[in-house]
Amino acid sequence: MQAKNGWHTWQKKMAAVLAAGVIMVPGAYVLAPAPVAHAEFGWGSVIGAGIEGAMAHAQLSKFLKKYNDSEEGRQEFFEEMKKEYGVNNDYALNSRIDTIMANLTAAIGSVDPTIYDKPYNYFINNDTSFNAFCTLGHNMSINTGLFSVLTNDDEIAVVLGHEMGHGQKDHPAKGARRSLNMQILGAATGTTLGSIVTTVINNRNITKPMEREADALAFEYITHSNYNPGATAAVWQRVMDKEKTQPSSFQQFISDHPSDGDRRDTYVKKLYEYSNKHVTAKDGTIKVNGKDFVTPAASGDMSGAERSYFVLGNLAAAYHNGQNKNQAHVDGKTVMLGNQPIMTSTYDDESAQKLAERLNTIK
């Protein structure tokens, strides 16, 4: 997604743009233009007709090495991002993001210690649409609008975990290189590098396999954190629910990616596997060992379907961690399985006691 203000000034000021970030939107991820290289890099010396392909490849490699791999370059890139997009310094929002990023970094570090070689830079920008992206140099930005759609940290963590999955696999740099290489192949026959810049700005170049890989990594990261793994499915249910009431937040849409429903259902399958094939959910009803357990009611701004995936996540975690060997019991209005909270009954739900008794008969 392009920034609304200063875009043409930005193009004139900078000699090149490499962008390969992805943004959480209903049904897909959308291109997020990343800030451009500083003019002193020397793109001006290679833009023009008749540039040899080998020279262009060398310049591209030099660009990526500086702005994706070097500490100096990626910090320079990050500062340019903040200038272009603007920074939201809201204390409460930034505190939440600091906590989520710290938790995700620890979770990722437990399975991929390379994260500590290039720690993520991140900031909240002022855009009011539903959006977050990771681009070159492990530089991330989160739209203010994300918080108007997602209100709990578990779902926000899924969004950011997906973006960090792209970063860990270097998808942004691979996407930028692929985009530019398609143009560079024709450089010796007259294609200008100026057209390459336009190609990078206007194309995502994040493949479906990359998207699926980032989705899978988000699940792995969440299951190595204290966040509810059911949030991986719940977030997509919420996006589908909110798209009906907040369509202006989801105007940018790309149709050549898996749908929200497909992503949700893929995560439900992962949760089934994570539970050692004991629990699943469909149409708002959670099943344990193939038998109906509960159909949660809507609560607050959360639909019953969205809420069901959080219950599913708690049950999956209980079975994964062996808490199912214990009897279900009640703590206040909360159904417990061992030391794992499963569901807190609201006024419109069945009583916690009744649910605990049912769970003990089918678990």
Residue ranges and their predicted role:
Residues M24-P35:
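C-terminal segment of classical bacterial N-terminal signal peptides
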Residues D349-K363:
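C-terminal partner/receptor-binding element of secreted or periplasmic proteins
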